Amino acid sequence: MSGVAGVGKSTVLEIVSKGTQYDVVNYGTLMFEMARELSLVQNRDELRKLSVDTQINLQKKASGAIGKMDNVIIDTHMAIKSPKGYLPGLPEWVVRELRVSMFFLLEASSKLIWERRKKDPTRVRDKDTEEEIEEHQSVNRYYAVAYSVFTGATVNFITNIEGMPDIAANKIIMELKKE
């Protein structure tokens, strides 16, 4: 499960988790915990500021740990916007470890996401414009399709309507029940 920051992943995934037998594992949180143990970062938002090599090493460690788990939904990012450009959130060596069967990409209007980010004092977010958010959502779509080609996993695009996360969650639950 993926989507840009502020799209509502955590809210939707909380509903999905309650309605299924799946546990939710946050890939970024696992990477953060590993990076913090190494004294590389103090907060989660610093992860994307690390060198690309460091991020790749953390991705490998986290994917190895998650790959050993069963019946999990991974809360992650298809593309990570870094100072040097977009970094694949699920490069080949990661998806191989994870054994992905479905990709869900949660989306919303860039204006709505921009407004949500402004209201969230709990995170240190980049000051992206609506256009940059839209670009990031497009890049996420490209990456999702590329990952699907490599894994054979299906891709599902889910719209998170403001104030109605149950609708998005129920679409995901229905797809998971088909598996």
Roles of regions detected by a PLM:
Residues 76-120:
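ATP-dependent NMP and nucleoside kinases share a basic, alpha-helical "lid"
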Residues 8:
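Conserved glycine(s) of the Walker
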Residues 141-179:
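NTP-dependent small-molecule kinase module
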Residues 12:
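Hydrophobic positions on the alpha1 helix immediately C-terminal to the Walker A/P-loop
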Residues 27-88:
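ATP-dependent small-molecule kinase phosphotransfer cores
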Residues 4:
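P-loop (Walker A) phosphate-binding loop of NTP-binding proteins
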Residues 18-25:
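Post-Walker A helix-loop "phosphate-sensing" segment adjacent to the P-loop in P-loop NTPases
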Residues 1:
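Hydrophobic anchor at the beta1->P-loop junction of P-loop NTPases
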